[in-house]
Amino acid sequence: MTTKYNEIYQSSINNPEKFWQEISEDIFWFKKPTKVLNKFNPPFYKWFEDGVTNTCYNALDYNIEQGRGEKTALIYDSPITGNKAKFTYKELRHKVSKFAGALDNQGIKKGDRVIIYMPMVPEAVIAMLACGRIGAIHSVVFGGFASNELASRIDDSKAKILITASCGFEPGKTVEYRPLVDGALKLAKHKIEKIIFFQRKGYEIKLNSPKEISWNEVLSNSKDMDCVEMKSNEFAYILYTSGTTGVPKGIVRDIGGHIVALKWTMKNIYNIDADDVWWSASDIGWIVGHSYIVYAPLFKGCTTVLFEGKPVGTPDAGVFWRIISDYKIKSLFTAPTAFRAIKKEDPEGKFFSKYDLSSFESLFLAGERADPDTIKWAENLLNVPVIDHWWQTETSWAISANCTGIEMQKTKYGSACKAVPGYDVKVMKPDQSLTKPNEMGDIVVKLPLPPGTFSTLWNADERYKKTYMSNYESYYQTYDAGHIDEDGYIWVMSRTDDIINVAGHRLSTGAIEEVLSEHQSVAECAVFGIADKLKGQLPIGLIALKAGVQKDNETISKECIQMVRDKVGPVAAFKTAIVVKRLPKTRSGKILRGTVRKIADNEEYKMPATIDDPTILDEIKQDLIKNNISKV
């Protein structure tokens, strides 16, 4: 029987040009494209090559033309500061247009790069959209990132202006941006021409040089700016991904394909219409923030929420429920780690019962693999579909998902459901042959990738080809490992460098983590491989417990080891499960398994630029030493 999903998916694969041409009719073009896809120079494919449009026009002006000017575009809620604000589409356009005029006054023209190093405040969104309005290319850097990381982005992008703030806030602490910015400017070889500081109330700083200007001052004599016409294949933004060494990779997003694909996803993947309120609990410094706090919801014309807070500690594990209740949110998109944190602090869901969540219809998880136990916990608590889906900074939207706006598929716990229309996903062996159903391998996507995905790296075409497009001919290598089952469900088990080899058996750390997370006392866990003379590698488990657990650590460890032996088998040689206070993560919630492995193997490692709290690594090192895993 042909289902609606199968019909749409097959049409996207069998005739992608017709499929995307029809979808492209749904956005605003100054000049509609006559060519859908240029494939004459693979892997540098170009979508809607001769089309002319504008990112900001589609996000704001087009919605106002459609009669949505008085509708709320952006809700800001900061439990850290207590500040709240709402902006209609007209109000947001006015602020964006004025700031675009301010950038124009500072000499910013089409194609110039602008770095945005900001906390989660409305001014950050305004700056992003203002860049799009005048054709500048923004590069958002996570607010509070280390000076050397900011400097590398300044040097690679050759940005003219840096837009920043006096500070950011984390639970219980203020992060001053001035020392970080000053440090970056000293390290950077490229010289920034101007720095615009947004002064946070009560945390104003003194401006030290003629290069520095306050947000309010730069707006004082600015004029409104209209949107400039942009070719479809010009760039909307650069978003850098951190490598462990060398120059970070600058992912670039072309304008036309970005608008077409992201607007389509809001209804087809997330079932969001223009009348709905949508919340993506991420940060604008990450791809989820770019795509699903700012661009996709505004392209769709719905209401989007900008949240300056954390899932726990601002003030408690009920803040997510308060936001959903206050703003009548239909769907939430966040990382699995957010729900693990809530589950750890409030395993019984006591905070949940205090709020009215009658508007809430679905929860979407992505960022790293969602273990089945967390999904089931959330399902039981929320009584709505909880959907794990999979995508990457490089793609900007989901590769596999349960497309709720097309047709709900049956849930298979541990799978990110089926390929999204547009993505021809395969699993391959290193010899370039296809795997059998349920056989582990490298997950790849047939070229050309759909619109909205990255078309190259900033000033690094050869690096783009070599890194992503050369290992599997005519395929994009995702660097994720997993399998596809007999029903077409995609199981993303781990990054390819998280596959461990135990006595010749290739095992996924994700498969072992899935078992550990089923233990009733375990809130979250991480598995990594250490070097072993006899077996090559051995898996080690780190487990963090739920709040209020009474059972002793030794008993829990023994039970976890037995569970892995029972469910994965003796082949895993899993003999060590260490209870730790907390796990080392990036600010976006990814667990730093590779860094922990290096600590365990006494290898040199670089402090990850994205680490949430560097002190955790010392805690982990001491735990490993106590358990005879690492030597001083």
Which residues does each PLM region occupy?
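Conserved ATP/PPi-binding loop(s) of AMP-dependent carboxylate-activating enzymes
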Residues: 418-422, 433-468, 507, 604-605
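AMP-binding/adenylate-forming catalytic core of the ANL superfamily
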Residues: 141-166, 181, 325, 332, ...
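Conserved pre-ATP/AMP-binding loop-to-beta segment of ANL
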Residues: 70-72, 195-198, 208-240, 247, ...
